[in-house]
Amino acid sequence: MNNFNINDKEFTGTKKRIFPYFSVGMVIVGAAMLIGGGIWTATTDMSRYAKNGVIDVVDAVDGGNVEKVDIVVNTGTVYVGRSDDGQVHIEGKIPKDYVLKEKNGTLKVELRTSFGFSFDWQDLFDWKYNEIDAKIYLPDAKFESFEISGGAGEITVDDLNCVEAHIKTGAGEVSVNNFNCDKVLKIDTGAGDVKVNNAVTGGIDFDTGAGEVDFYGEVNGDIDIDTGVGECTINLTNDKAEFEKKYKVDIDTGVGETSVNYNQ
């Protein structure tokens, strides 16, 4: 048992408090910087950049020659689905300098925005990001390759058909539905949930740092899943005996439960 010496001191009289000049000064400086920054933001080009980093857009290009799809978005929410008129459509809140073009069979979509905020004197602390919220519709065709890269945010991909696919995101949720991929479907995410529903693939290769992984569908190839923290659930429509004759399952989870279920 440790012995501590505690010296009780009896204080008499009244102790004079020192005026907190430093603390008050820092508050004044902080307020001045906040107000000054707001004035600067509201009266310079930075105002236009912060408030108009994203704009409402409705655009389209011909998709008849598209064989490969390459989409890059650094933050925000992106939905990718199927169009019904053979064109590529994009709509939503999108950076002013967005890229939407097809060249030599490759569709290039780039949506990049930087941090920004809006300053409102009536609501001083209503800070807002220039977040992207975009919908992209692709022709009803089978693409040689489909790739989408996102920095942070949500990515949803529905009703697509391709030979190979790669979905990458730094942090955020990935949702894939009604997806056909002849070869391996690759999904890489630093942190966030990965959910694949009603898919047919030639294999799956998922790598996630933290988050849950859920897959439901048919896999005609190897399964390779690496997750640091989180649960992993694979529900296959394949027959277990037939699958194990042809393919292998390699699942590595640092912390969390893993289960692989087959068609009964």
Residue ranges and their predicted role:
Residues 2-73, 77-150, 156-168, 179-188, ...:
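Acidic (Asp/Glu) and glycine-rich low-complexity loops/linkers
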